[in-house]
Regions:
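Weak global preference for isoleucine
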Residues: 7, 23, 73, 80, ...
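Eukaryotic calmodulin/EF-hand partner-binding IQ helices, IQ-like basic amphipathic helices, and related
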Residues: 41, 99, 103, 118-122
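Short, surface-exposed, charge-dense and proline/glycine-enriched linear segments
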Residues: 52-64, 80-91, 117-130
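Amphipathic protein-protein interaction modules
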Residues: 68-115
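Polybasic, proline/glycine-rich intrinsically disordered low-complexity segments
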Residues: 106-141
Length: 143
């Protein structure tokens, strides 16, 4: 069995978010619940996984022993889910502020574009890792 923490800890080595740190300090259970939500998003995206990704949400673990590469891929999908959430939050804040200054608007647009570029690069990284993962077991596929 692979614990959720193993995947989330790997993902958190990439993410530096003061809000997550503060949530962890204030309420570890809420922190875990938030992280588990992002992990469920990651599980839904990892459709190519050769193992069953069934899990026990109470025990916070997968039923299977996931490989190092499977853990890595899920952690990167977790990071993508986090980035998408951050990007959506930033876009919503900008809309609510209704900033009239062209400089600020352009800066916000550039910031949004950069965040989108990061997400695109993460997706490319996950795609490469997934292709490597599938090639490891190429003999199992019927041609």
């Amino acid at each position: 069995m692979t614990s959720f923490d193993k995947i989330e800890d790997l993902a958190l080595t990439v993410v530096s978010d003061y809000k997550l740190g503060k949530l962890f300090e204030q309420d570890e259970e809420k922190f875990k619940k938030f992280c588990d939500g992002l992990l469920m998003n990651a599980v839904a995206q990892f459709t190519e996984c050769r193992q069953d990704l069934a899990y026990d949400d109470v025990a916070r673990s997968f039923d299977a022993d996931l490989s190092v590469l499977e853990v890595y891929i899920l952690s990167r999908y977790w990071v993508i889910a986090w980035w998408e959430r951050e990007t959506n939050n930033a876009a919503q804040i900008a809309l609510k502020l209704k900033v009239s200054s062209a400089f600020t608007f352009n800066s916000e647009a550039q910031n949004f574009k950069e965040k989108q570029n990061i997400i695109d690069k993460l997706r490319e990284e996950v795609d490469r890792a997934t292709q490597d993962y599938l090639l490891l077991d190429i003999a199992a596929y019927e041609f």
